[in-house]
């Protein structure tokens, strides 16, 4: 059997190795050689080349000084552990003067100052010196720096301060509204990936579909712990506030090789996410985030502490003095001091209670009280308007009482309100036995319809359909509530209610229908003109004859025949019948009665006046009317 692998029974397979970025790629080597070759082209032969442009020949002694860009920064105030600290925003990152931090630690304990300086060297924190313009900007606007009598400033980024505090913090400090109720059945799984670049397993993983949340820092958020420590770490079971939890992790700490920027604990709303993204959990988390913002911001002068804050309990790990082997030993020795944790909690509660007794409303709302709050939108303006209506006792109950006293005050206020309401309804019931409470209807989100409508069944069909359509619109608006601000949500509701008819509003307000209007009174009948008896003396025959002739009616007059004689008379040619020249009045009355019996003259009877017959007879005497 030969030594050569060719033809041997045991074939040696080539070693399979995933190519790394540091491997020498022949293509890159060829490109590099071509680049070096083309850069050596000094003669301009008209051929394309990748070499750099030739420098212009200038006279000796002429030097071009290029101005180096330097961001002078913008002065601003930031909050650090409840204290207002001056800072400079350089390239979008706030930088704090280290001299201010040294002065704060010196007032507390000189050992803390030495430990802080050793910690900066151990953590290999990047520190920059302030330029003259930056130094003047801080000294002119900050009285704290002016009182230090310093000639230079050393700036440290807020990201480094935040991450160092997060690495040293074991638990958050107790708040004023702290209680020990940690209900396991009422918690939500949350996670943050603020320090995922420390996780070497995630960085070295080749799985492109791996969820980054699986490698994050996990914890449990308790819903019933608002304005206090509400998140428990899943790994160490430490209790944290949201601002402290995003700086907490259990990755191996790397003192060098990373540059942290943009680390801001006040952005916990964007950094913490719900791991179990069910509708119930997301709705509860969004409500918690919304209620975490106060109605208005205090001014910086009013927000400054009026009294010296009490000394904080030992809830954080001590800062080491040396960076050698004594590091772990100091942690163990200091960690053994806190044995009885419940006793420390009771002491902290007692200290907070004494502190609350010395506080006033001005410590929460400033010297000007609720009138000094400046709203940022209409929703905050409504809240501040309600605060201005409250008396001193109500404001004191809101800000100065303990949680137990506050809950008792709320229950007493609700009971008083119910008693007063029942008394008013009882008085109305005594006056009117048919009185009913006029509580308006309410929209049930789970059912998607309105409840407590007593007059819905008695409403018209169009009104009932309109209320059902309004309920569908309210249900759609409730689905989009997560994407809207509270003020936008209220304006959408008002816009929907503006288009509702008056009868639908009446049904939603539980107002009974209006009684039907009484029928209108019948119109007054015109009084008939008194009918006077017809007499021949009141008839105007002249006017009557003119009306008859104008209407085309011919009066039926009798044919007059000559008297009969016994002697034969000669034959006389007949002539048209005519009235006698001198008829008597009796004959005329007889003829007029015959004419008035005609149906065509019945409509003229009410118009005949007294003496009409006599006038008509006088007219016929002088006028001949042909038949």
From Swiss-Prot:
One of its GO terms (biological process) is positive regulation of dauer larval development. It comes from the Eukaryota. Residues 1-22, 34-58, 299-318 are annotated as: Disordered. Expressed in ganglia in the head and tail and in the anterior pharynx. Residues 1-12 have a biased composition (Polar residues). Keywords: Nucleus. One of its GO terms (molecular function) is RNA polymerase II cis-regulatory region sequence-specific DNA binding. GO terms for cellular component: cytoplasm; nucleus; transcription regulator complex. InterPro entries: c-SKI_SMAD4-bd_dom, SAND-like_dom_sf, Tscrpt_reg_SKI_SnoN. Probable component of transcriptional regulatory complex with SMAD protein daf-3. Required to regulate entry into a developmentally arrested larval state known as dauer, in response to harsh environmental conditions. Involved in larvae undergoing cell-cycle arrest during the dauer stage. PANTHER family: CORL, SKI ONCOGENE-RELATED. This is Ski protein homolog. It comes from Caenorhabditis elegans. The gene is daf-5.
């Amino acid at each position: 059997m030969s030594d050569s692998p060719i033809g041997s029974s045991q074939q040696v397979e080539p070693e399979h190795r995933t190519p790394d970025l540091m491997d020498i790629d022949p293509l890159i080597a060829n490109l590099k050689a071509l680049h070096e070759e083309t850069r050596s082209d000094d003669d301009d032969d008209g051929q394309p080349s990748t070499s750099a442009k030739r420098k212009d020949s200038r006279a000796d002694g002429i030097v071009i000084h290029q101005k180096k860009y330097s961001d002078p920064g913008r002065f601003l105030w930031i909050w650090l552990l409840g204290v207002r600290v001056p800072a400079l925003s350089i390239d979008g990152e706030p930088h704090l003067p280290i001299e201010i931090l040294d002065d704060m630690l010196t007032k507390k304990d000189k050992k803390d100052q030495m430990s802080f300086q050793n910690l900066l060297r151990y953590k290999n924190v990047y520190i920059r010196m302030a330029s003259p313009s930056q130094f003047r900007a801080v000294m002119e606007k900050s009285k704290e720096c002016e009182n230090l009598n310093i000639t230079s400033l050393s700036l440290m980024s807020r990201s480094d301060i935040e991450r160092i505090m997060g690495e040293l913090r074991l638990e958050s400090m107790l708040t004023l509204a702290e209680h020990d109720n940690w209900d396991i059945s009422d918690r939500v799984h949350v996670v943050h990936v603020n320090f995922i670049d420390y996780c070497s397993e995630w960085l070295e993983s080749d799985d492109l579909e791996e969820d980054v949340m699986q490698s994050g820092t996990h914890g449990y958020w308790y819903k019933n712990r608002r304005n206090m420590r509400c998140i428990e770490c899943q790994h160490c079971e430490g209790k944290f506030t949201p601002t402290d939890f995003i700086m907490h992790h259990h990755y191996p700490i790397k003192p060098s090789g990373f540059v942290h920027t943009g680390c801001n604990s006040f952005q916990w709303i964007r950094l913490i996410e719900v791991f179990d993204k069910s509708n119930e959990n997301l709705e509860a988390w969004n409500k918690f985030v919304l209620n975490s913002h106060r109605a208005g911001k205090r001014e910086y002068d009013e927000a400054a502490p009026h009294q010296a804050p009490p000394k904080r309990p030992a809830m954080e790990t001590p800062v080491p003095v040396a960076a050698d082997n004594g590091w772990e030993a100091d942690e163990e020795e200091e960690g053994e001091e806190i044995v009885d944790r419940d006793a420390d909690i009771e002491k902290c509660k007692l200290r907070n209670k004494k502190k609350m007794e010395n506080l006033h409303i001005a410590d929460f709302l400033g010297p000007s009280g609720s009138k000094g709050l400046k709203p940022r939108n209409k929703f905050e303006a409504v809240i501040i308007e309600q605060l201005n209506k409250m008396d001193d006792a109500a404001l004191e109950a809101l800000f100065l009482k303990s949680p137990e006293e506050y809950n008792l005050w709320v229950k007493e206020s609700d009971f008083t309100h119910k008693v007063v309401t029942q008394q008013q309804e009882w008085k109305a019931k005594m006056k009117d036995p048919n009185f009913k409470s006029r509580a308006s209807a309410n929209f049930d989100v789970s059912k998607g319809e309105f409840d407590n409508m007593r007059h819905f069944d008695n409403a018209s069909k169009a009104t009932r359909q309109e209320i059902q359509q309004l309920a569908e619109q309210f249900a759609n608006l409730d689905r989009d509530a997560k994407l809207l601000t509270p003020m936008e949500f209220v304006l959408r509701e008002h816009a929907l209610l503006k288009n509702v008819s008056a009868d639908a509003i009446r049904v939603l307000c539980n107002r009974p229908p209006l009684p039907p209007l009484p029928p209108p009174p019948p119109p007054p009948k015109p009084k008939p003109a008194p009918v006077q008896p017809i007499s021949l003396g009141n008839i105007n025959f002249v006017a009557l004859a003119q009306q008859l002739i104008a209407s085309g009616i011919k009066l039926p007059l009798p044919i007059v025949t000559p008297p009969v004689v016994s002697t034969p008379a000669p034959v006389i040619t007949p002539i048209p019948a005519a009235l006698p020249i001198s008829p008597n009045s009796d004959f005329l009355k007889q003829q007029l009665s015959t004419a008035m019996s005609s149906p065509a003259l019945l409509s003229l009877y009410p118009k005949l006046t007294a003496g009409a017959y006599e006038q008509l007879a006088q007219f016929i005497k002088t006028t001949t009317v042909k038949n």
